[in-house]
Amino acid sequence: MKKNLTNIYLIGPMGAGKTSVGSQLAKLTKRILYDSDKEIEKRTGADIAWIFEMEGEAGFRRREREMIEALCKLDNIILATGGGVVLDEKNRQQISETGVVIYLTASIDTQLKRIGQKGEMRRPLFIKNNSKEKLQQLNEIRKPLYQAMADLVYPTDDLNPRQLATQILVDIKQTYQTYENRTR
């Protein structure tokens, strides 16, 4: 059973729109949006690509686990997670137990388009030469984990972040009728 319905966590692959939708959710609910990758960068003073290069994926995942633990202790937040947050069992447990988990999905083509628009240097697991294959590989591993955690699922290929954020809030209130009372 959920211990805290005041937090909204956005999970899904890179390029699914977690930060865009999270920004709109934050505006609509007058809450702070946290992006776990950006919070790691703030704490370390280094970008994610550098952390991957210097510490490897294991070092980054350790930092991510520490950040998720800290953020899950907060109340009334919107959290856009990194795509790989679901790889760690402790992350999955903390996120699932402390808020409503929204899984945003996107086709591989949509992901490629969005990642290309933002630039890939910030995304260490996105490799230009075989990017489509890499995204498919990541999806095969992560999709079952996203699905297992999700309270609500939304495709974002035809994304209008504000409309989707509004629909998410309506669905949360309908699914968890006490949600509105707990956020006051």
UniProtKB/Swiss-Prot annotation:
SUPFAM superfamilies: P-loop containing nucleoside triphosphate hydrolases (SSF52540). Keywords: Amino-acid biosynthesis, Aromatic amino acid biosynthesis, ATP-binding, Cytoplasm, Kinase, Magnesium, Metal-binding, Nucleotide-binding, Transferase. One of its GO terms (molecular function) is shikimate kinase activity. GO terms for biological process: amino acid biosynthetic process; aromatic amino acid family biosynthetic process; chorismate biosynthetic process. It catalyses: shikimate + ATP = 3-phosphoshikimate + ADP + H(+). Its cofactor is Mg(2+). Pathway: Metabolic intermediate biosynthesis; chorismate biosynthesis; chorismate from D-erythrose 4-phosphate and phosphoenolpyruvate: step 5/7. Its main location: cytoplasm. Catalyzes the specific phosphorylation of the 3-hydroxyl group of shikimic acid using ATP as a cosubstrate. This is Shikimate kinase. The lineage of its organism: Bacteria, Pseudomonadati, Pseudomonadota, Gammaproteobacteria, Legionellales. The gene is aroK.
